[in-house]
Amino acid sequence: MSNIISSNRPGSGIKWQWPSIHPEGRKFLLIAGIVTLCFWLLGWEILGWLMLGVTLWVGAFFRDPVRVTPASDDMIIAPADGLITQIAEVPPPPEIAGPDGLGDAPMLRVSIFMSVFDVHINRTPVAGTLRKLVYIPGKFVNADLDKASEENERQHFVVERADGVRIGFTQIAGLVARRIMPFVSMGSELATGQRVGLIRFGSRVDVYLPAGTTPKVLLGQRTLAGETVIARIGQAATIDGIGQ
């Protein structure tokens, strides 16, 4: 997909377009479509309508919309579409702690829960070099639970910025999600908002923010991967909000 440069300069504009389907989802869409067609050919109309709904949902699940990523070195961008369910200070995961990872000091963790209706393409929150990529097999408990960070199947990423600051994020499988797929490898040079992985069928992403980072999101806020600014590097005023 070609890059689209957006601007807020007078006279600039962009046309809406249908989101493409990620290649990983095309086989599922094809299978669902074939089953739907078979039901209709056999005269099983009720099942045909049900499978048509499933086919449309599969297409929506694997949609891969274009996102316009803010270009600023101090911004940390949401890696996932979803709902902010937790903002807490916690130790970094042991698999990516220590001097070659995120260190051992407590970090601010922002958790984003993705429902089965959200886009499930995940993106890197900052530009830099992928220093660690660690897959951990595990359980499939509800991804909205706190223990999912330690018990569920998960994939850890540690990205080091050009200034040496390291940021971690973790894809976590859930009750329905049974497959985590990274698109990148150790040592990859990543751009902010670049597609880095996919979790199939509902899950969560945790972001581990370094010291001196100010969160710019609130509990209950929705995010868009590659677009929503969730934090800024450096001290600044925190924000409050009202649910209404």
UniProtKB/Swiss-Prot annotation:
Q: Tell me a Gene Ontology molecular-function term this record carries.
A: phosphatidylserine decarboxylase activity
- Which Pfam families does this UniProt record tie to the protein? PS_Dcarbxylase (PF02666)
Catalytically driven reaction(s)? a 1,2-diacyl-sn-glycero-3-phospho-L-serine + H(+) = a 1,2-diacyl-sn-glycero-3-phosphoethanolamine + CO2
Question: Required co-factor?
Answer: pyruvate
Residues with site note (Cleavage (non-hydrolytic)): G202, S203
Q: How is it modified after translation?
A: Is synthesized initially as an inactive proenzyme. Formation of the active enzyme involves a self-maturation process in which the active site pyruvoyl group is generated from an internal serine residue via an autocatalytic post-translational modification. Two non-identical subunits are generated from the proenzyme in this reaction, and the pyruvate is formed at the N-terminus of the alpha chain, which is derived from the carboxyl end of the proenzyme.
Pathway per its UniProt entry is:
Phospholipid metabolism; phosphatidylethanolamine biosynthesis; phosphatidylethanolamine from CDP-diacylglycerol: step 2/2
Signal peptide residue numbers: none
The cellular component terms of Gene Ontology attached to this UniProt record, alphabetical and capped at eight, are: plasma membrane
UniProt keywords, alphabetically: Cell membrane, Decarboxylase, Lipid biosynthesis, Lipid metabolism, Lyase, Membrane, Phospholipid biosynthesis, Phospholipid metabolism, Pyruvate, Zymogen
Q: What is its EC number?
A: 4.1.1.65
Modified-residue entries (Pyruvic acid (Ser)), positions: S203
How and how many cofactors are bound, per the record note? Binds 1 pyruvoyl group covalently per subunit.
Q: Which subcellular locations apply to this protein?
A: Cell membrane
The entry's active site is S203 (schiff-base intermediate with substrate)
Q: What kind of membrane protein is this, topologically?
A: Peripheral membrane protein
Name the GO terms of the biological process aspect: phosphatidylethanolamine biosynthetic process
The free-text function statement in the UniProt record for this protein reads:
Catalyzes the formation of phosphatidylethanolamine (PtdEtn) from phosphatidylserine (PtdSer).
Q: Which family, according to UniProt?
A: Belongs to the phosphatidylserine decarboxylase family. PSD-A subfamily.
Q: What NCBIfam families would the database entry show?
A: PRK05305.1-2, PRK05305.1-3
What quaternary structure, including any partners, is listed in this protein's UniProt entry?
Heterodimer of a large membrane-associated beta subunit and a small pyruvoyl-containing alpha subunit.
Q: What is this protein called?
A: Phosphatidylserine decarboxylase proenzyme
Q: Coding gene?
A: psd
